[in-house]
């Protein structure tokens, strides 16, 4: 049985309620002031639950009124659990439960990797793909007194790291593979274009050299033909002169008479 009682009260009731001691029931006695004005009247709600009484105070007008509300409520399991336990016991159980949860969190293995850790590690691996991690091997003392060195594993390439991390990040692995394939295709196309340019340049050089050799050969041939023609012309001229000398009749040339001297045929004297 839970009962609610609303009645007007003064500040003296509040002081008397605060000075009273807590009962042995598991219910908690508390007071709450909604308006701390000392001149205003206050109303009080008494809440009876499980054998205890809880009082709540709030501000109201000066008209006194009383209101009782009786509510029947089943409290079987709750009373059976809370019976025999005080507030300190409940608080100790809460604190011990929090400590247990903290200890359970601390006992979790540290090798668990979250998604943020994996993405950060993958970005670091991609940024340092071209760098070689050179570290001094650490010394370790064995039980027999001898020393051994632990050599760290080297990262070979970012592509291997991306392929090895497919289990934790499938999207990043696919993206890295697509980027590597695009880079490989671009490099292959660039290499093919370079090879084609070199082959075309070599073919043009060969054509130029062949044309130059052909021109030189033609010039030499023309020079030889010119010399041969000049020789033939000279020989033909000599043969013709020889034939003319054989065919012509020899003629004796008579000497010409001397020319008459000029004289004056008429002369006049003045």
From Swiss-Prot:
Residue intervals of the bZIP domain: 187-250
Superkingdom of origin: Eukaryota
Q: Give the location in the cell.
A: Nucleus
Gene Ontology annotations for the cellular component aspect, listed alphabetically: nucleus
User: Sorted alphabetically, which keywords does the UniProt record give?
Assistant: DNA-binding, Nucleus, Phosphoprotein, Transcription, Transcription regulation
SMART domains the record matches: BRLZ
Classify the main location: nucleus
GO annotation terms (biological process): positive regulation of DNA-templated transcription
Specify residue ranges for compositional bias: Low complexity: 8-29, 261-270
Matching CDD domains: bZIP_plant_BZIP46
List GO molecular-function terms, semicolon-separated.
DNA binding; DNA-binding transcription factor activity; sequence-specific DNA binding; transcription cis-regulatory region binding
Fetch the InterPro entries from UniProt. bZIP, BZIP46-like, bZIP_sf
Chain spans, region Leucine-zipper = 215-229
Q: Where is this region: Disordered?
A: 1-46, 250-270
Q: Which residue ranges does the record annotate as region Basic motif?
A: 190-208
Q: Which residues carry this modification: Phosphoserine?
A: 27
Summarize the protein's role: Binds to the G-box motif (5'-CCACGTGG-3') of the rbcS-1A gene promoter. G-box and G-box-like motifs are cis-acting elements defined in promoters of certain plant genes which are regulated by such diverse stimuli as light-induction or hormone control.
Concerning its family, UniProt says:
Belongs to the bZIP family.
Q: How does it assemble?
A: DNA-binding heterodimer with GBF2 and GBF3; non DNA-binding homodimer.
UniProt name for this protein: G-box-binding factor 4
Q: Which organism is it from?
A: Arabidopsis thaliana
Name the lineage: Eukaryota, Viridiplantae, Streptophyta, Embryophyta, Tracheophyta
């Amino acid at each position: 049985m839970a009962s609610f009682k609303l009645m007007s009260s003064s500040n003296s009731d509040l002081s008397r309620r605060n000075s009273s001691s807590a009962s042995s029931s598991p219910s908690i006695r508390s007071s709450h002031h909604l308006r701390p004005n000392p001149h205003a009247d206050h109303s009080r709600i008494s809440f009876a639950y499980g054998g205890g009484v809880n009082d709540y105070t709030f501000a109201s007008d000066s008209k006194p009124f009383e209101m009782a509300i009786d509510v029947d409520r089943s409290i079987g399991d709750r009373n059976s659990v809370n019976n025999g336990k005080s507030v300190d016991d409940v608080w100790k159980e809460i604190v011990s439960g929090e400590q247990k949860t903290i200890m359970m969190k601390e006992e979790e293995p540290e090798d668990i990797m979250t998604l943020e850790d994996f993405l950060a590690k993958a970005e670091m691996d991609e940024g340092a793909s071209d760098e070689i991690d050179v570290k001094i091997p650490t010394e370790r003392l064995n039980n027999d007194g001898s020393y051994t060195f632990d050599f760290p594993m080297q990262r070979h390439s970012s592509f291997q790291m991306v392929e090895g991390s497919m289990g934790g990040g499938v999207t990043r692995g696919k993206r890295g593979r697509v980027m590597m394939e695009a880079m490989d295709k671009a490099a292959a196309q660039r290499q093919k274009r370079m090879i084609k340019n070199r082959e075309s340049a070599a073919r043009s050089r060969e054509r130029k050299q062949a044309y130059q050799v052909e021109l030189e050969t033609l010039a030499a041939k023309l020079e030889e033909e010119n010399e041969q023609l000049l020789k033939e012309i000279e020989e033909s001229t000599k043969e013709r002169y020889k034939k003319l000398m054989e065919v012509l009749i020899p003629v004796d040339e008579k000497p010409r008479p001397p020319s008459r001297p000029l004289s004056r045929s008429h002369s006049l004297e003045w």
